[in-house]
Amino acid sequence: IADIQATLAFARTENLPISIRGAGHNIAGNSLADGAVMIDLSTLRSVSVDPVAQRVFAGPGATLGDIDHETKEFGLAVPTGINSTTGISGLALGGGIGWLTRRFGMTVDNLISAQLVTAEGDVVIASATENPDLFWALRGGGGNFGIVTRWEFAAHPVSNVFAGLVVF
């Protein structure tokens, strides 16, 4: 977090735009901007599971595969997308539709909280009870409200799931 705050302060001082890269899944390179300082979060892939509370905590660079790998040991799943290389940050900030959406809702419906660094460098928590307007904005509103440094999601018990595409 200190590195992010220092980078934001430098960019402000030098009047430089910033760009944020989550897991780097987007093939169009939307996290790139000419002349900008990029904050690359792709190595922040930690995932921890609290099986009793049925909560998952993920770093901003975690992929859906990272999350699935950690939750399956406990028979839990977070409703995410369909591609294991997709980053949780881009997916959650965009809404998140996947195999479990019909049963448990979109990814953002299962977001409990997000820790983020604001443009001013402040570390805040956004949840239904703490900074609720910011929480509402994060839930599908894109990545322009701060730099998320930790996600907290509700996880759900699941048995074996068979899913795939049928092509004729």
Q: Residue spans of the language-model regions?
A:
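Soluble FAD-dependent oxygen oxidases
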Residues: 1-168
